[in-house]
UniProtKB/Swiss-Prot annotation:
UniProt protein name: Secreted aspartic protease 5
Entry keyword Iron-sulfur: no
Residues binding pepstatin A: 108-110, 161-162, 294-298
Gene name per UniProt: SAP5
Example GO molecular function: aspartic-type endopeptidase activity
Record flagged with keyword Hydrolase: yes
Length: 418
């Protein structure tokens, strides 16, 4: 999850709940299922929390049919267009404690701490639709009911890029994931949060929000002999798919084309690699920068110069929504790819359509202009709309990330990472 203030968008989220897991020697596999629910989990703006967002177009800014009309709109006046955006979160079922208390948590490569809501947590409403005990609807933790619970009497405090936060105390207890049990796992038991569910951060130890480094889940899985390396692979599948997969300690060789290409991680705290250039429909943009590969971020973020070149290449135009936020739109039929060139001659090609999202007339009919799902930021982040086109292996031990073009298939050929 992007740990920096960013402009986010009103969202229909795709909540991905962990399906039954398969356990194999040397690795732990979790399969994810996709379902839609109306939330706006990445929206820090007050206006977006209160009402839907709109764009206004004049008739000259969109095509009309032979009669001079396009369903609901007259050529003589402007038209309001509703913004509906999707966010994707990847969640897994875990158990905590000797009594196997069940919780569902977001799996996040952009952070490093596991935290879960206490059974008496105070849920602080932040987004539209947050009511009652919304923050523990996916489960909560009762230390008193677990014989193996240990209160470390150390405070925990974390804040995410969308403005959500979690506060509590550090505990140790048994954590079950993917059919295995991790003993004495350190995590935060949270008594106050504005987030909708707990988060399982699986990044570097140095990225932990605590004042000291500890063994987070990937490290514990390795140290307790469950996996051979503190590493995991991520397969998000296609945008239309209903399943995805993360494998701790393993790689599915059936899920990518060609060979995996190793890239050194360029940060001590974040899972970043070097990006050399971006080619947009034949227009090359020098990047020479580091990018974070973040499963907890739905869209992608770049510095201003990269964003402007991408927008120009796809013919985007700037608009302002009803809350005053800057929005870029482009023809929904824009074809071609955006090619990301990394070191060691690795190229990942992403369809332009991955960076476009449908807008709608207020009647619900699709509008011919789509929102461009790229944002300006001081940091460069490749989110889910990039990661769906790549098979990514995060190796925390060897400080490298390996990637290859994704292959969408139901076939499987899993090997352990040694």
């Amino acid at each position: 999850m992007f740990l920096k203030n960013i402009l986010s968008v009103l969202a229909f989220a795709l909540l991905i709940d962990a399906a039954p897991v398969k356990r194999s020697p040397g690795f732990v596999t979790l399969d994810f299922n996709v379902k839609r629910s109306l939330v706006d989990p990445d929206d820090p703006t007050v206006e977006a929390k209160r009402s839907p967002l709109f764009l206004e177009f004049t008739p000259s800014e969109f095509p009309v049919d032979e009669t001079g009309r396009d369903g609901d709109v007259d050529k003589r006046g402007p038209v309001a267009v509703t913004l509906h955006n999707e966010a994707i979160t990847y969640t897994a079922d875990i158990t905590v404690g000797s009594d196997n208390q069940k919780l569902n948590v977001i799996v996040d490569t952009g952070s490093s701490d596991l935290w879960i809501p206490d059974s008496n947590v105070i849920c602080i409403p932040k987004w539209r639709g947050d009511k009652g005990d919304f923050c523990k609807s996916a489960g909560s933790y009762s230390p008193a009911s677990s014989r193996t619970s240990q209160n470390l009497n150390t405070r925990f405090d974390i804040k995410y890029g969308d403005g959500s936060y979690a506060k509590g105390k550090l505990y140790k207890d048994t954590v079950g994931i993917g059919g295995v049990s991790v003993r004495d796992q350190l995590f935060a038991n949270v008594w106050s949060t504005s987030a909708r569910k707990g988060i399982l951060g699986i990044g570097f130890q140095s990225g932990e929000a605590t004042e000291f480094d500890y063994d987070n889940l990937p490290i514990s899985l390795r140290n307790q002999g469950i996996i051979g390396k503190a590493a995991y692979s991520l397969y998000l599948n296609s945008a239309e798919a209903s399943t995805g997969q993360i494998i701790f300690g393993g790689i599915d060789k059936a899920k990518y084309s060609g060979s995996l290409v190793d890239l050194p991680i360029t940060s001590e705290k974040k899972l970043t690699v070097g990006l050399r250039s971006v080619n947009v429909r034949g227009r090359n943009v020098d990047a020479n920068t580091n990018v974070l590969l973040d499963s907890g971020t739905t869209i992608s973020y770049f510095t201003r110069s990269i964003v402007r070149n991408i927008l120009y290449a796809i013919g985007a135009q700037m608009k302002f929504d009803s809350a005053g936020n800057k929005v870029y739109v482009a023809d929904c039929k824009t074809s071609g790819t955006i090619d990301f060139q990394f070191g060691n001659n690795l190229k990942i090609s992403v369809p332009v359509s991955e960076f476009l999202f449908q807008t709608y007339y207020t009647s619900g009919k699709p509008f011919p202009k789509c929102e461009v799902r790229i944002r300006e930021s001081e940091d460069n982040i490749l989110g889910d709309n990039f990661l769906r086109s790549a098979y990514v292996v995060y190796n925390l031990d060897d400080k490298k990330i390996s990637m290859a073009p994704v292959k969408y298939t139901s076939e499987s050929d899993i090997v352990a990472i040694n």
